[in-house]
Amino acid sequence: MATQKIRIRLKAYDSKLLDQSAGEIVETAKRTGAKVAGPIPLPTRINKFTVLRSPHVDKKSREQFEIRTHKRLLDILEPTQQTLDALMKLDLSAGVDVEIKS
């Protein structure tokens, strides 16, 4: 019989908020008796935007802005029904995007 696994992928712009949410998920899963692998840091995606500083002239004068998207991966191995219930009731921060695959 194959073992069950829940894969949770977290994304956020703030790395501290992301690590805090990952810690809450790990703590909840371990408390309910499941094994946890992670959080595994995935590569940070950096989107850069270059704009002209002046609205009219000076093409050489530019400014760059960037958005960093931090990602973490968690694997919950052999989850129990109690683990699933606890994860569904877990209230995470609004700035963290959670994707769950089973």
From Swiss-Prot:
GO terms for molecular function: structural constituent of ribosome; tRNA binding. Keywords: Ribonucleoprotein, Ribosomal protein. One of its GO terms (cellular component) is ribonucleoprotein complex. Transmembrane segments: none annotated. SUPFAM superfamilies: Ribosomal protein S10. One of its GO terms (biological process) is translation. Disulfide bonds: none annotated. InterPro entries: Ribosomal_uS10, Ribosomal_uS10_CS, Ribosomal_uS10_dom, Ribosomal_uS10_dom_sf. Involved in the binding of tRNA to the ribosomes. Part of the 30S ribosomal subunit. Belongs to the universal ribosomal protein uS10 family. This is Small ribosomal subunit protein uS10. It comes from Myxococcus xanthus (strain DK1622). The lineage of its organism: Bacteria, Pseudomonadati, Myxococcota, Myxococcia, Myxococcales.
